[in-house]
């Protein structure tokens, strides 16, 4: 009996520690090539082996994807390869040939090598949570990399409510068929019509955890950065997005994707705004899509914590 109570107390203490644990999230108000390098260096994680920098290449020139000029210095400092996957809906990135033309139009290929991860096929990663998806389908080139910088543009999203590092790790790293598998909550890798919203969000969280776990193997690692600029209610996958109504906020980074996305959401929801600076459209987009649930479910899966310590590097 004493042994039982001792084990119980240890378990309760561990649960209490986990509930109170905080992850560090670094923050700068400056959005520049220099500040992007500075906030990455604040993480104190040194890359090893071949480095992937996961970005979104943007559906059109009207999309609000991160500019090559902004990311060039960081990517070149780590000798990184820009990585992306083809989309699941045709358009300018629906196959590798048109996607490479899009990449060239954006100028990404002028700053670093660019690898379309699913250009030669796809592989399956195991998932911890099989409620909806039973594996995560990603580009077959992913095992070529030892270190990933998940470099996301934080903004709204038509389906997920918002897009940050969790979406960039899940939908972003998924192959074309893998994207459909997540969107359909494990029903199909082909065209889907309608999915329960929470099932889709929970599938994203499970897929993000699969990618995180892959890069937490011995000899590998992953870090996360959100750039909070040009925050339209629409994703960079939209070729004709709404104009941003919210002013730029800065760059945030962490080794914990849950804490990072939560910190960005908190900045948006607590923002007072003013003339020409209106957070309400983005807040409405997040709320109507139940977007916060992705973060909540990712925490439930053990991917990270919503408790964070925001550290300014300015």
Show the residue positions of the predicted features.
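Bacterial Sec-dependent N-terminal signal peptides
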Residues: 1-22
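Extended, low-polarity segments enriched in aliphatic/aromatic residues
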Residues: 22-314
């Amino acid at each position: 009996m004493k042994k039982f109570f001792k084990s119980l107390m240890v378990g309760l203490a561990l649960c209490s520690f986990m509930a109170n644990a905080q992850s560090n999230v670094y923050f700068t108000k400056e959005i520049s090539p220099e500040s992007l390098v500075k906030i990455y260096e604040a993480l104190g994680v040194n890359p090893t082996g071949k480095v992937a920098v996961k970005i979104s290449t943007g559906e059109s020139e009207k999309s609000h994807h991160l500019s090559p000029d902004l990311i060039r210095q960081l990517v070149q400092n780590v000798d990184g390869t820009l990585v992306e996957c083809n989309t699941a809906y045709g358009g300018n990135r629906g196959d590798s040939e048109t996607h490479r033309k899009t990449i060239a139009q954006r100028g990404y290929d002028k700053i670093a090598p660019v690898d379309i991860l699913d250009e030669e096929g796809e592989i399956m990663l195991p998932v911890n949570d099989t409620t909806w998806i039973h594996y995560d389908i990603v580009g077959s080139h992913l095992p070529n990399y030892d270190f990933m910088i998940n470099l996301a543009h934080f903004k709204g999203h038509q389906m997920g409510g918002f897009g940050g590092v969790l979406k960039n790790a899940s939908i972003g790293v998924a192959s074309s068929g893998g994207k459909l598998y997540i969107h359909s909550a494990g029903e199909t890798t082909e065209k889907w019509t309608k999915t329960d919203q929470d099932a889709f969000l929970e599938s994203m969280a499970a897929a993000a955890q699969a990618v995180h776990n892959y890069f937490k193997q011995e000899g590998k690692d992953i870090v996360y950065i959100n750039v909070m600029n040009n925050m339209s209610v629409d994703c960079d996958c939209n070729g004709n997005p709404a104009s941003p109504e919210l002013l730029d906020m800065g760059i945030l980074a962490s080794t914990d994707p849950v804490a990072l996305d939560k910190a960005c959401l908190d900045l948006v929801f607590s923002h007072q705004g003013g003339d020409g600076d209106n957070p309400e459209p983005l807040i409405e987009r997040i709320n109507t899509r139940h977007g916060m649930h992705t973060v909540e479910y990712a925490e439930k899966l053990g991917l990270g914590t919503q408790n964070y310590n925001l550290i300014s590097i300015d």
